[in-house]
Amino acid sequence: MAQITFKQEPITLLGSQVKTGETAPEFTLLDNDLNEVNLSTYDGQKKLISVVPSIDTGVCDQQTRKFNEEASQEDGVVLTVSVDLPFAQKRWCASNGLDNVITLSDHKDLSFGKNYGVVMEELRLLARSVFVLDKNNKVVYSEIVSEGTDFPDFESALEAYRNI
């Protein structure tokens, strides 16, 4: 188990961290209409998976906007994952006029968080992280932000995404 901090407090991450070069593990998430979505839903597409603790916070909001603005110009898909309820994710998208943002919820069973090693045990939230997968689901970039209130390395993640 790895440790990070959140607001400078130590946090334990559950699960096995996904590393560059590995095949990404499967997951089951809920979309905004409560439909189950799996990694295989996006087979044949490159993927930028942006993981945030809660979509309604300032840093998470900015992270979601930045990745969608920058990466949506590429051929692929950008997924934002949090444990927010699908209704809250849908409301956030609607209130911000962002119809093209794909938000997915891991609130049901934390399968994504456990499989990717990003469940913050003490908070039952997901650690801020970014995973870039090629069309065959090979992990080409993986970052778990060491302080949960900091931004990820946008440029490195976007460069990895563009270079697929």
Swiss-Prot record:
Where in the numbering of this chain does the Thioredoxin domain appear? 18-163
Q: What Pfam families does the record point to?
A: Redoxin (PF08534)
**Which family does the record assign?**
Belongs to the peroxiredoxin family. Tpx subfamily.
Q: Show the active-site residues.
A: C60
Keyword set for this entry?
Antioxidant, Disulfide bond, Oxidoreductase, Peroxidase, Redox-active center
Question: Is this entry keyworded Membrane?
Answer: no
Function, as annotated, reads: Thiol-specific peroxidase that catalyzes the reduction of hydrogen peroxide and organic hydroperoxides to water and alcohols, respectively. Plays a role in cell protection against oxidative stress by detoxifying peroxides.
Disulfide bridge positions per record: C60-C93
Which PROSITE patterns is this protein grouped with?
THIOREDOXIN_2, TPX
Which HAMAP family did the record assign?
Tpx
Oligomeric state and partners? Homodimer.
Q: Name one GO molecular function term.
A: thioredoxin peroxidase activity
Report the EC code(s) recorded for this entry: 1.11.1.24
Q: What else is known?
A: The active site is a conserved redox-active cysteine residue, the peroxidatic cysteine (C(P)), which makes the nucleophilic attack on the peroxide substrate. The peroxide oxidizes the C(P)-SH to cysteine sulfenic acid (C(P)-SOH), which then reacts with another cysteine residue, the resolving cysteine (C(R)), to form a disulfide bridge. The disulfide is subsequently reduced by an appropriate electron donor to complete the catalytic cycle. In this atypical 2-Cys peroxiredoxin, C(R) is present in the same subunit to form an intramolecular disulfide.
Which Gene3D superfamilies does the entry link to? Glutaredoxin
**UniProt catalytic activity:** a hydroperoxide + [thioredoxin]-dithiol = an alcohol + [thioredoxin]-disulfide + H2O
Q: What is the recorded name of this protein?
A: Thiol peroxidase
Q: Which domain of life is it from?
A: Bacteria
